[in-house]
């Protein structure tokens, strides 16, 4: 397993990566990619850290919102995702605030602005993701960025892999974790991959479900475009030209 920490960011021996799955974690980001037949994992502090290792046309799936509204209205892709995850996992799709709201640096300010714009506040869970939402939002406009980046919601992806049926068990439970790992069979021996990550990284930096989510994003990234579903099919574009769409296995 390739290891990258916040203090060692030499990726000279890695790549070019043609497909990657990324999930946020306490230490920054977990990146899953394939090196030959082996699935490797990296933990990086910033999204830009992985750029040099990505092929110019790499397929990158990330569990973080891409495309933000200006008026704080609900994103269509989130509404579709909630419907697809009924009745068990719809709550896993949180409302994504307007770009202006995500730029707030303290919760009272963000909550006040959100209420002023739409009459609805924001959850603290959503607020805690703002730094990562801002980072991704800015990174996607970088001229140096490699790869084609898509938003991927792990629970939507797992539902698709499960015959379009949302998983009733939470990923935080042993049963839910086991079910999700079984659905990742396309990637090979994910049990060993996950265990190597847990043996390498501290729980305060990376959790098992962070790794599992990165892996299902990788599985989606490795699918050819005709074997992917895009929600919605006629995705709207935000003010910065970013498509508001969620990708999943077809």
Label the model's feature ranges:
Residues 2-19, 24-250:
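RNase H-like (RuvC/DEDD) metal-dependent nuclease/polynucleotide-processing core
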């Amino acid at each position: 397993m390739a290891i990258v920490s916040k203090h060692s960011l030499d990726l000279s021996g890695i790549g070019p990566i043609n497909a990657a799955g990324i999930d946020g974690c306490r230490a920054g980001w977990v990146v899953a990619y394939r090196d030959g037949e082996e699935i490797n994992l990296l933990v990086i502090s910033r999204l830009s850290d992985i750029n040099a290792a990505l092929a110019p046309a790499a397929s990158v799936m990330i569990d973080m919102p891409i495309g933000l509204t200006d008026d704080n209205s609900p994103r269509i892709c989130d509404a579709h995702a909630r419907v697809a995850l009924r009745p068990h996992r719809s709550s896993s799709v949180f409302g994504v605030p307007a770009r202006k709201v995500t730029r707030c640096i303290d919760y009272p300010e963000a909550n006040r602005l959100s209420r002023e714009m739409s009459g609805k506040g924001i959850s603290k869970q959503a607020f805690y993701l703002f730094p990562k939402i801002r980072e991704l939002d800015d990174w996607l406009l970088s001229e140096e960025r490699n790869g084609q980046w898509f938003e991927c919601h792990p629970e939507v992806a797992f539902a698709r892999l499960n015959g379009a049926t949302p998983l009733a068990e939470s990923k935080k439970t042993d049963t839910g974790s086991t079910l999700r790992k079984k659905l990742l069979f396309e990637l090979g021996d994910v049990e060993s991959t996950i265990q190597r990550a847990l043996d390498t990284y501290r729980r305060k930096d990376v959790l098992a479900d962070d790794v599992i989510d990165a892996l299902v994003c990788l599985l989606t990234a490795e699918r050819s475009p005709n074997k992917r579903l895009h929600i919605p099919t006629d995705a709207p574009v935000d003010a910065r030209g970013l498509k508001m769409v969620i990708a999943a296995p077809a």
